[in-house]
């Protein structure tokens, strides 16, 4: 199989289906095409977190899923996106929400911390996928968000804030389409 060189590096701005993203990381995947870990440059909409701070069951997840569906209508082959596992451990360490495999989701606090030096500040406040504490605590209906200043805070899950999805895309999606590549033949599994 031909190996495709990644033409981007962390901090670069790329466009997929009309949405601009910042490259957070490049993952080398052996014989598979390298992948780019991308974060929407700005909010792509607004949503309440939901009735609890469990991202897996949230209105925020539904909003991201709807956005991803709309991206498909604008030309992004969602089947080519590489699932990533997000850890829904809350800020206080409660692991009650487990992990979740997603094609797109807001960053978790751990991811936001890891890429803090690369992430550009967005114009509006945006949710993270991380809850403040477990559901049995008095502040179990709070989740983390990032203010337009770049600071992290907690807000009640009923608040409406920006939706800023992150996703992993194979580098082949950024190859020149004039090369006549058949993307259906490119594996996305590891």
Regions inferred by a protein language model and the residue ranges of each:
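Collagenous Gly-X-Y triple-helix signature in extracellular proteins
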Residues: 1-190
């Amino acid at each position: 199989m031909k190996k495709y060189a990644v033409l981007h590096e962390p901090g670069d701005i790329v466009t997929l289906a009309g949405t601009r993203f910042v490259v957070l990381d490049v993952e080398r995947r052996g014989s598979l095409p390298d992948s780019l870990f991308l974060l929407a440059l700005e909010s792509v909409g607004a949503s309440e977190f939901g009735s609890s701070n469990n991202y897996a069951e949230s209105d925020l997840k539904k909003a991201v899923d709807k956005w991803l569906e709309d991206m498909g209508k604008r030309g992004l082959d969602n089947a080519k996106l590489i699932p990533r596992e997000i850890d829904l451990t809350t800020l206080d360490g409660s692991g009650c929400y487990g992990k979740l495999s997603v094609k797109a989701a807001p960053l978790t606090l751990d991811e936001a911390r890891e890429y803090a030096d690369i992430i550009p500040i967005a114009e509006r406040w945006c949710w993270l996928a991380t809850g403040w504490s477990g559901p049995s605590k008095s502040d179990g209906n709070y989740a983390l968000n990032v203010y337009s200043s770049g600071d992290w805070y907690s807000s009640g899950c009923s608040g409406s804030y920006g939706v800023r999805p992150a996703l992993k895309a194979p580098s082949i999606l950024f190859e020149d389409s004039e090369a006549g590549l058949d993307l259906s033949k490119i594996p996305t599994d590891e």
